[in-house]
A protein has these predicted regions:
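N-terminal Sec-pathway targeting helices
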Residues: 1-18, 24
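Poly-acidic low-complexity segments
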Residues: 2-5, 22, 100-107
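Polar/charged alpha-helical tracts
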Residues: 4-6, 27, 63, 111-115, ...
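Short, charge-rich amphipathic segments
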Residues: 6, 38-39, 43, 121-126
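Acidic, serine/threonine-rich low-complexity disordered tracts
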Residues: 18-101, 144-227
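An acidic-aromatic
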Residues: 73-139
């Protein structure tokens, strides 16, 4: 019995010593977002496009403001196209352009009249491709990616959710945000709609870089919408 007691005491001492040596390393480790909300829905660019919604945005970038009506056409032979109608305003004629939809929503083969507007859409509505070509969780505090602004690193994450009001109506939505200087940059997502429904993005000096909002939505087949 004395030998067993000595062995037990020695084992406790060894465990304590190992824990003491390991603690400085464990305590300095940075753990990421490892508890995935497995019950939450997920979203990616293009999710819900098969329901062929028609989404009309007001888009502003710098001094350019216009309306963009985007109709997701039915899938044909495994491919899908997007019909975009640009209304430049100011009495200018509407510009129509049909483009094939790819994974990253990068439309380079467009007509000369529509190119300036597609360049704006590329920097605004379609820019969500940088963070969500793969499925991301729609849950509070879920992280969607890292942003590097100058010497600072920020995380894009879900900061709010619930029923929210927009120009097109109300819907259960998810707010993603990150800070640049004194400004919070915000992007709103509605599950089963293939593009973000709203965004307000600022530059490091606090100036509005671009904004857009879904003003009209025709999506009778899209599940889960609340109007």
């Amino acid at each position: 019995m004395p030998n067993i007691r000595i062995i037990a005491i020695f084992a406790v001492i060894v465990i304590a010593a190992v824990a003491g040596l390991a603690w400085p390393f464990i305590s300095t480790m940075k753990f990421g977002y490892i508890m995935e909300p497995v019950q939450a829905s997920q979203w990616h660019m293009g999710k819900g496009s098969e329901y062929t919604p028609e989404m009309t945005y007001q888009v502003t970038l710098n001094q350019t403001t216009f309306l963009a009506d985007m109709k997701f056409l039915p899938v044909s032979q495994g491919a899908q196209q997007l019909l975009v109608k640009i209304n430049p305003g100011g009495g200018a004629s509407e510009i129509d352009q049909t483009v094939p939809i790819g994974l990253v929503y990068d439309f380079v083969d467009v007509s000369a009249p529509s190119k300036p507007y597609f360049d704006v859409l590329d920097q605004s509505v379609f820019s969500m491709r940088d963070y969500a070509t793969e499925a991301k969780y729609l849950a509070k505090d879920a992280e969607w990616g890292d942003l590097y602004i100058g010497a600072n690193a920020e995380k894009l994450k879900v900061t709010d959710s619930g029923k929210m009001s927009f120009k097109f109506g109300s819907a259960d939505a998810y707010l993603l945000s990150y800070r640049i200087g004194a400004k919070m940059n915000k992007i709103w997502i509605v599950d089963n709609l293939p593009l973000p429904v709203k965004a307000e993005i600022y530059d490091p000096d606090g100036n509005l870089q671009y904004s857009y909002e879904l003003g009209s939505l025709k999506a009778p087949s899209t599940p889960g919408l609340i109007s």
